[in-house]
Amino acid sequence: MSKSLIVSSPGKTILFGEHAVVYGATALAAAVSLRSYCKLQTTNNNEIVIVMSDIGTERRWNLQSLPWQHVTVENVQHPASSPNLDLLQGLGELLKNEENGLIHSAMLCTLYLFTSLSSPSQGCTLTISSQVPLGAGLGSSATISVVVATSLLLAFGNIEPPSSNSLQNNKALALIEAWSFLGECCIHGTPSGIDNAVATNGGLIAFRKATAHQSAMKEFLKPKDTLSVMITDTKQPKSTKKLVQGVFELKERLPTVIDSIIDAIDGISKSAVLALTSESDKNSSAKKLGEFIVLNQKLLECLGVSHYSIDRVLQATKSIGWTKLTGAGGGGCTITLLTPECKEEEFKLCKESLLAHKNSIYDVQLGGPGVSVVTDSDSFFPQYESDFDFKKLNLLSKFNKYYI
């Protein structure tokens, strides 16, 4: 068993297909270069320690206090399709005095995976840190689930670190995705599975849900080039549930009109997949994607899910690129693809304008690699661990070892 290892995985953004995907349209998600990290250290102490270093929180439990009697995992290589409700209830009792909802969710997810994948006789410390902003629709909870699941699968010998054996790597990725989905269920109840799929595999994922007229689809794609984009967090709170309900009610009132909009968004998503995976000229591809972004945003406005905070970002960024909301809308985040002609001075002025309105800005690359692993058998691990401990997360990517 490795005594110390660090795992990371990327957040995600929805490029095209928001809301329409609920009704069977194709949507396109991409990994972003903001990553979450988990350091696992095995210890001789008879306890599990979980540290959320970004918010200065630490929780610890004696191993014997965990509800091992509810663990029913017969074979880690064949995870269940849904979480063990008795185990969830037992862990919920352990966390009943945890008042902070964010901490409660993270601890429940981590403890569920720990009890399912570890041993009652092996102490561990799990330290979690993240560049992915919470509650911004960028898949922060999925990244946590993926890094915790991967760390435990590695530490207890159920998968191997990345190697030149692609078959072994693919098997490991499938197992990580399956277990991280169960971790996501602890947080979100009934997640789509897309966030943890992107956080595991990276790249792009085109997906659609099953309907009476079509089967479900999930296709992993590798773009010709990574795309540099700007994500703007408007900090405007929103209710995804209310926004989805609003589109449903609009569709009930105007079915023919809204069905046409959904079909148009489906066409945009499919066209974007072709542009990203087959377009040879990067500038030509960017301009084509820019047109799709503008069209998709207009159609989302027709569905009533935009917001004045998003409009403000659209206005501020129109001279430097193409912008649309990403995720549920109603505030939240936008994504801006810069034009090939964008000048540094224009970009700087735009960012200053957005920051003046209390937005947060993230310069990211889309379509990059998925989960990565560095272990204490790697010669550079001491430096990597030091950078992690001092939260120099931006320095770590050059060392990461990826499954894909």
Curated annotation (Swiss-Prot):
Catalytic-site annotation from UniProt: 195 (proton acceptor)
Pathway membership: Isoprenoid biosynthesis; isopentenyl diphosphate biosynthesis via mevalonate pathway; isopentenyl diphosphate from (R)-mevalonate: step 1/3
InterPro entries: GHMP_kinase_C_dom, GHMP_kinase_C_sf, GHMP_kinase_N_dom, GHMP_knse_ATP-bd_CS, Mev_gal_kin, Ribosomal_Su5_D2-typ_SF, Ribsml_uS5_D2-typ_fold_subgr
Residues holding ATP: 12, 130, 135-141
Cofactor: Mg(2+)
Subcellular location: Cytoplasm; Nucleus
Residues where Mg(2+) binds: 141, 184
E.C. numbers: 2.7.1.36
Catalytic activity: (R)-mevalonate + ATP = (R)-5-phosphomevalonate + ADP + H(+)
Gene Ontology annotations for the cellular component aspect, listed alphabetically: cytosol; nucleus
Activity-regulation annotation: Farnesyl pyrophosphate and geranyl pyrophosphate inhibit mevalonate kinase by binding competitively at the ATP-binding site.
Principal subcellular localization: cytoplasm
Enzyme class, UniProt record, top EC level: transferase
Function: Mevalonate kinase; part of the second module of ergosterol biosynthesis pathway that includes the middle steps of the pathway. Erg12 converts mevalonate into 5-phosphomevalonate. The second module is carried out in the vacuole and involves the formation of farnesyl diphosphate, which is also an important intermediate in the biosynthesis of ubiquinone, dolichol, heme and prenylated proteins. Activity by the mevalonate kinase erg12 first converts mevalonate into 5-phosphomevalonate. 5-phosphomevalonate is then further converted to 5-diphosphomevalonate by the phosphomevalonate kinase erg8.
Family annotation (PANTHER family): MEVALONATE KINASE (PTHR43290:SF2)
NCBIfam families to which the protein is assigned, alphabetical: mevalon_kin
Family from the record: Belongs to the GHMP kinase family. Mevalonate kinase subfamily.
Subunit and interaction comment: Homodimer.
Protein name: Mevalonate kinase
Source organism of this protein record: Schizosaccharomyces pombe (strain 972 / ATCC 24843)
